[in-house]
Amino acid sequence: MAQVDRLGQVTNVYDLGQYKLHHDYVFDDNGDLLILASDSKGDSVEDMVIKLNISTGDVEKVLDLGELFPDYKASCVENTDGELDWMHINTIQWLGDEEVILSSRETSTILKITDLYEEPKVDYMIGVEDFWKDTAYAELLLEKNGEFVSQGGQHAVTYVEDAGLPDGQYYLYMFNNNIGVSQSRPEYDWAEAIENVQSKPYEGTTSMYYKYLVDENAGTYELVDSFDVPYSGYVSSVQDMEHNTVVDSGFAGIFGEYDEEHQLIRQFTMEKEKFIYRVFKYDFEGAVGKYQFLAPKS
C-alpha cells in the first residue's frame, strides 16, 4: 500500500504481509485504513477486510466473510482461473460506529456489516430474493418497495446521509452494471432473476445509475432515481457532485458528466489496454474541475 501526496509523489509504502490489496479502501474515524484484501495463504479471494494503522504500519484482519457465510461459501466452486472468488467484494463504505457497507459483485448483493472490530455480523442485505432463497441468509434481505429491476454486478456503491431524512434512512447510489455472472454458482440463471440482465463484459445493451432510499426502520429499500449509461459489464463508477453526476463506463473506455436532469454535458473516450477502473472529479481552487484516474485493480 503506497501513500502519495497531492503532487503524486510517494511518501510512504506499507507492507501488508500475507494480504493483497484489491479494489477499494476507506478511512475509519480514527484515521486508520480499512482495505479490501485477499489472504495469500487462504483458500479464497476478495472476501476479507484488513485494517492498516498508518502511524505504526500494523496490519490486522478485521473481517472474513467466510466466517459470516460458512454454509454459502462451502456450496460455491472455483472459477475458471482456479480461484474461489465466491463474494468478489468491490466497494467498502464507512458509516461510523464500526459499521460498513460492502458491495459483492459475484452475488449482486449489497451488505451492511455492524460491530466490525468486535464481533462482525451481517445487519442486512440488498439483493435478488431468488438468489438467496433456500439459504440461511434469505431472512437478512431488505424488502423491495416498488416495482423495479434489481441491481446486477454493481460497483462503486456510495453511502449518503441526508439531514432531511428521518433517523434510520439514507441513500445508496451506484453504477448498476446490469450483468449477472456467478462462476462460483455456474448453475444459477441470472436471466431468470433479473429482467434484461446481460452476461458479457463488453457486449451489452445498457448499464444504469441507481439510487436507493434505504429505510432500516421499515426494513425496506426503494429506487428513487435512475438513468441509463453506456454499458460496462465490470468495473466502472459513478460520483454525484452538487448537481451533476460523473459516470465511468470502464470496459467501454467512456466517461462523462451528466446534469441534474440526467442530460449528457460532455463525454470522453479513452484508448485503453483493458479498462478505466474508476473516474473521479475534484475541484481545485483557481482551476477548472480535474479528473483523477485510479489504477486498475491487480
Task: Locate predicted features.
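Histidine-/acidic-rich catalytic cores in large beta-rich domains
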Residues: 1-298
